[in-house]
């Protein structure tokens, strides 16, 4: 009886899962958001504040907040943390000069109380560009293996083509099934 109830509950459970998409300016956050929501590339300009879209994957609803990444906006990221289940960090794989800034922002975020249970998905974006950092390099620069308090996954992607994005969503879906 309990198993039947659980299966029926899953059919009708329309719980929304809050996701924030962060990263430095020009990393590709907004492009990824609109690839998820419209499955196409849209012309974007720097995000001032945030964009929000609901994405439905296999009857699972994600409310995705794309938050501006300019230096002047990063201090306000924490206002979006409440009830966040997943953090997507978008890394510009061509931006070797600012990978250390990305690392600083990442660890600042992970230390925040409101994100202590959040899963972490890192999109290594712009993998289509020659001479970009590999997933292994980014993982090493960000010291991802030192993250013990959060489930995390790093995924190579290209926001312009959508390559790798579905695999990231699949990882998030797999984390929800475990809960």
Swiss-Prot record:
- Lipid modification (N-myristoyl glycine) maps to 2
Which family, according to the similarity comment?
Belongs to the small GTPase superfamily. Arf family.
Give GO terms: molecular function aspect only.
GTP binding; GTPase activity
Q: Which residues bind GTP?
A: 23-30, 66-70, 125-128, 159
- What keywords would UniProt list here? GTP-binding, Lipoprotein, Myristate, Nucleotide-binding
Annotated gene: Arl5a
Q: Which Gene3D superfamilies match?
A: P-loop containing nucleotide triphosphate hydrolases (3.40.50.300)
Q: Which SUPFAM superfamilies match?
A: P-loop containing nucleoside triphosphate hydrolases
Purpose: Lacks ADP-ribosylation enhancing activity.
Q: Which GO terms describe its cellular component?
A: cytoplasm; trans-Golgi network
Query: Among its keywords, does the record have Lipoprotein?
Result: yes
Q: What is this protein called?
A: ADP-ribosylation factor-like protein 5A
A biological-process GO annotation: intracellular protein transport
Which Pfam families is this protein grouped with?
A: Arf
Tissue pattern of expression reads:
Low amounts were found in most tissues examined with highest levels in brain, intestine and thymus.
């Amino acid at each position: 009886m309990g198993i039947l109830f659980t299966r029926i509950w899953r059919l009708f459970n329309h719980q929304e899962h809050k996701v924030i998409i962060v990263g430095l300016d020009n990393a590709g956050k907004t492009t990824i958001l609109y690839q998820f929501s419209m499955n196409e590339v849209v012309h974007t300009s720097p995000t001032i504040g945030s964009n929000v879209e609901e994405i439905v994957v296999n009857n699972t609803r994600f409310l995705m907040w794309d938050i501006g990444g300019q230096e002047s906006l990063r201090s306000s990221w924490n206002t979006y943390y409440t009830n966040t289940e997943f953090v997507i960090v978008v890394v510009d794989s061509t931006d070797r000069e600012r990978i250390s800034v990305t690392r600083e922002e990442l660890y600042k975020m992970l230390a925040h109380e409101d994100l202590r249970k959040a899963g972490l998905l890192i999109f290594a974006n712009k993998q289509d560009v020659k001479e970009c950092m590999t997933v292994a390099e980014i993982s090493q620069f960000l010291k991802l293996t030192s993250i013990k308090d959060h489930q995390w996954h790093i995924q190579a992607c290209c926001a312009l083509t959508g390559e790798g994005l579905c695999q990231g969503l699949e990882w998030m879906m797999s984390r929800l099934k475990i809960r």
